[in-house]
C-alpha cells in the first residue's frame, strides 16, 4: 500500500516537472510577456487615443519589487490552501479515529 503511494507521488512529481519544462522547448524563441502588456497593445490597436479610466492605488517603485510582491502573494495563497487542506485532512483523521472507537 505504501509503495503504491510512493510510486504515485513520484509519477505526479515527474509530471509536474515535465509540464513545467516543456514550454521552454516548444517555444524556444517565444516571448513570455505579461497579460497586461498584451491587453495594452490590443487596446492601442483599436483606439490610439484611449486613456485608462482607473489608476492603481499603489505603484511599486521597480519591476523587481512588483515581482517580489507577486511572489509573496502567491506564497501566501499557497500557505492558505496548504493550511486548509491540512486542517481538513486532520479533521477527517480525528473523525475516523472517533468512529473507529465507537464501533
Swiss-Prot record:
Topological type in the membrane: Multi-pass membrane protein
Membrane-spanning ranges: 6-26, 68-88
GO BP terms: cobalamin biosynthetic process
GO cellular component: plasma membrane
Chief location category: membrane
Keyword set, alphabetical order: Cell membrane, Cobalamin biosynthesis, Cobalt, Cobalt transport, Ion transport, Membrane, Transmembrane, Transmembrane helix, Transport
Location of the protein in the cell: Cell membrane
Pathway this chain belongs to: Cofactor biosynthesis; adenosylcobalamin biosynthesis
Gene Ontology molecular function terms on file: cobalt ion transmembrane transporter activity
InterPro entries named in the record: CbiN
Functional description taken from the UniProt entry: Part of the energy-coupling factor (ECF) transporter complex CbiMNOQ involved in cobalt import.
Family according to the record: Belongs to the CbiN family.
Cross-referenced NCBIfam families: cbiN (TIGR01165), PRK02898.1 (NF002780)
Subunit composition and interactions: Forms an energy-coupling factor (ECF) transporter complex composed of an ATP-binding protein (A component, CbiO), a transmembrane protein (T component, CbiQ) and 2 possible substrate-capture proteins (S components, CbiM and CbiN) of unknown stoichimetry.
PANTHER family according to UniProt: COBALT TRANSPORT PROTEIN CBIN
UniProt name for this protein: Cobalt transport protein CbiN
